[in-house]
């Protein structure tokens, strides 16, 4: 009887802990720039705070991106997390069809495979299943978001929040005072317009806060010395991407906005996407979005380093 009571208490504690975790989905273009890998690693290493419902891939060779995500999950012992491929758009131009160097890390990996469901359908299903409970991270071109809106125009409004690495509002690349057509916006301008006009609760981690987050050589060396499955994967992918360049962790900032809201300053404004891929602010209109305008960069880097070094993910 005492054993049954003890088991019951343990079960209730487990259920309570799960209930307190934030449900999340990540939509990403893993494999191009290296920042997607650091974003996924931050999310995976934060399973004490996140209940990860799944990862979806977007833009270009979504099958190769999904294969890369599957291997990363397998290496860290988290292969139960589903991976769904978004619509393959590798035929739109040469850039979209690029076989990125990071893909070689997972080439031929077949121990875990993506689910059959498309990325858009997976996200729709999860948002319908858990209305107002899910944070959807969007850290790539928003082609999947467009597909979702066209299939189910109201469903993005069921997300508790969408946090998107998207846009350039007051600041451009490398801190320039001149704004730029940010990559995730300009890759699919039609999709970007639909996304910002979707009526969803969207928080934008644009260049205003992401362009300052640099991962220098000393930081990378600390990861290398950690020697864990997750940090080894990051180091391998970083080397394939570039052995010398300093990464900007654009996408990891989007994850950080959910983990560490105290490090960010935001502003509610009305934004729209123009025909050239600029994200324009119109302060004469009622706000339709929330944009990041400030970040405590040093503290953010310190915190994510702690997460990477203290995790013990593995098989």
List PLM regions with ranges.
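Bacterial Sec-dependent N-terminal signal peptides
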Residues: 1-21
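Active-site histidine-anchored catalytic micro-motif
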Residues: 20-67, 109-204, 209-210
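Metal-dependent C-N hydrolase catalytic cores
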Residues: 24-26, 63-129, 287, 291, ...
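Conserved beta-strand termini and adjacent loop/short-helix elements that scaffold enzyme active sites
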Residues: 58, 84-88, 205-207, 274
């Amino acid at each position: 009887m005492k054993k049954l009571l003890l088991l019951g208490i343990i079960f209730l504690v487990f259920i309570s802990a799960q209930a307190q975790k934030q449900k999340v989905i990540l939509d990403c273009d893993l494999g191009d720039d290296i920042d997607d890998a650091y974003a996924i690693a931050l999310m995976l290493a934060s399973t004490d705070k996140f209940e990860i419902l799944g990862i979806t891939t977007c833009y270009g060779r979504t099958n190769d991106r999904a294969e890369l995500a599957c291997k990363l999950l397998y290496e860290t012992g988290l292969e139960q997390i589903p991976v769904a491929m978004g619509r393959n758009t590798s035929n739109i131009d040469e850039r979209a069809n690029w076989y990125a160097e990071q893909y070689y890390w997972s080439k031929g990996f077949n121990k875990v495979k993506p689910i059959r469901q498309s990325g858009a359908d997976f996200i729709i299903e999860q948002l319908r299943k858990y209305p107002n409970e899910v944070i959807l991270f969007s850290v790539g071109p928003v082609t999947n978001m467009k597909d979702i809106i066209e299939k189910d125009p109201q469903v993005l409004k069921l997300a508790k929040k969408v946090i998107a690495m998207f846009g350039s509002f007051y600041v451009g690349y490398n801190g320039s005072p001149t704004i730029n057509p940010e990559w995730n916006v300009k890759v699919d301008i039609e999709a970007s317009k639909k996304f910002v006009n979707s009526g969803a609760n969207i928080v934008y981690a644009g260049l205003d806060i992401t362009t300052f987050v640099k991962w220098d050589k000393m930081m990378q060396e600390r990861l290398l010395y950690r020697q864990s499955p997750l940090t080894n994967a990051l180091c391998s992918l970083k080397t394939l991407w570039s052995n010398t360049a300093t990464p900007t962790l654009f996408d990891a900032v989007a994850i950080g906005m959910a983990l560490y809201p105290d490090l960010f300053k935001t502003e509610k404004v009305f934004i729209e996407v123009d025909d050239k891929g600029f994200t324009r602010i119109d302060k004469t209109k009622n706000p339709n979005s929330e944009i990041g305008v400030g970040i405590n960069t040093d503290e953010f880097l310190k915190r994510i380093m702690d997460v990477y070094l203290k995790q013990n993910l593995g098989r």
